[in-house]
């Protein structure tokens, strides 16, 4: 069955990409502007002659206009079933994560974080615009309850094609539930998997968007970077953001605090540049995006820093890595 709402959204997207107003398209087709509006609102579908004319105008097939694309099947070979989520991990939340998953649901985290993203945020808005300007399939890894860069990408381009992924099936299903009601976009897809072992075909993704996912992953960061390189198409980009504690900041800490931090959380002192090169990326552009302090944060590293009586300064960066 044809989803008229999704047809309307695709029809509107193709028209805008062509640079036409509803009135200009109506004049070209010999119909009224009201007819075009009905199509794009999902209230009607044009007859076959007009569909053929639209397919010629937009240089797409009639099926491209009418049918939802099973993008996840194309890039993974896995059908999503009735849930429309591709699960590569158990659908039940991991035992140690159940309390956190319940907090996401009961605390309405998804909606609150989405609404927060609608406010002006120069750094995140700029990153979203940069990612949205890239053509093709965007994979958001480690989406998390905050959504990563995804909300800012959609702010810049509501028609963007995005696969949202996370290791937590709760995160993925909660985002799908919310965005189905909020946007009902035919270009949003959902998958639960470990991005240290992506179930994606080689050279299948145009852009990978990572807002702290790799920096906070449960597996090996170096493996996650290698997987990102593998699934990107030649010319594709990994746009990644995370934070680390510089050697200078470490050296300024009390000696005992240095020893404990290096023993318990050596990962926070890694900027991942060398691992990014070893993954295969040869063109890497890094920009310092800001700073944050553990005294202002609620996290395991912040708790550790407070227990040691230190206020760790993290340097945040956004890094654009191109697969040449």
Stretches found by the model and what they are:
Residues 1-17:
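A short, Lys/Arg-rich alpha-helix, primarily the initiator
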Residues 74-135, 152, 171, 239-263:
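Conserved class I S-adenosyl-L-methionine
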Residues 222-234:
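A short glycine-rich, Lys/Arg-flanked "PGG" loop and its adjoining helix->strand segment in the class I
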Residues 264-280, 285-287:
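Short alpha-helix
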Residues 196-208:
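A short acidic, Gly/Pro-enriched loop at the edge of an enzyme's catalytic core
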């Amino acid at each position: 069955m044809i989803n008229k709402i999704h047809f309307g959204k695709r029809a509107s997207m193709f028209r805008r990409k062509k640079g036409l107003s509803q009135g200009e398209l109506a004049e070209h087709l010999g119909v009224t502007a009201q007819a075009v509006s009905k199509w794009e609102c999902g209230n009607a579908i044009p007859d076959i002659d007009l569909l053929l004319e639209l397919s010629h105008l937009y240089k797409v097939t009639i099926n491209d206009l009418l049918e939802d694309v099973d993008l996840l099947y194309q890039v993974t070979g896995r059908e999503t079933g009735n849930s429309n989520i591709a699960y590569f991990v158990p659908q039940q939340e991991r035992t140690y994560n159940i309390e956190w998953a319940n907090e996401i649901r009961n605390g309405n985290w998804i909606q609150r974080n989405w609404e927060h993203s609608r406010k002006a945020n120069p750094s995140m808005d700029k990153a979203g615009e940069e990612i949205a300007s890239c053509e093709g399939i965007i994979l958001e890894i480690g989406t998390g309850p905050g959504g990563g860069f995804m909300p800012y990408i959609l702010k810049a381009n509501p028609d963007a094609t995005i696969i949202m992924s996370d290791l937590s099936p709760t995160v993925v299903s909660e985002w799908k539930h919310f965005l189905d009601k909020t946007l009902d976009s035919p270009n949003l897809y959902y998958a639960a998997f470990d991005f240290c072992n992506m179930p994606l075909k080689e050279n299948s993704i145009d852009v990978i968007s990572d807002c702290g996912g790799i920096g906070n992953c449960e597996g090996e960061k170096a493996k996650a970077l290698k997987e990102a390189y593998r699934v990107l198409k030649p010319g594709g980009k990994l746009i990644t953001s995370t934070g680390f504690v510089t050697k200078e900041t470490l050296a300024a800490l009390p000696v005992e605090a240095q020893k404990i931090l290096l023993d318990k959380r050596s990962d926070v002192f890694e900027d991942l540049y060398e691992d990014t090169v070893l993954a295969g990326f040869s063109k890497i552009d890094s920009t310092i995006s800001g700073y944050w302090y553990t005294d202002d944060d609620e996290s395991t590293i912040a708790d550790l820093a407070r227990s040691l009586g230190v206020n760790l300064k993290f340097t945040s960066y956004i890094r654009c890595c191109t697969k040449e």
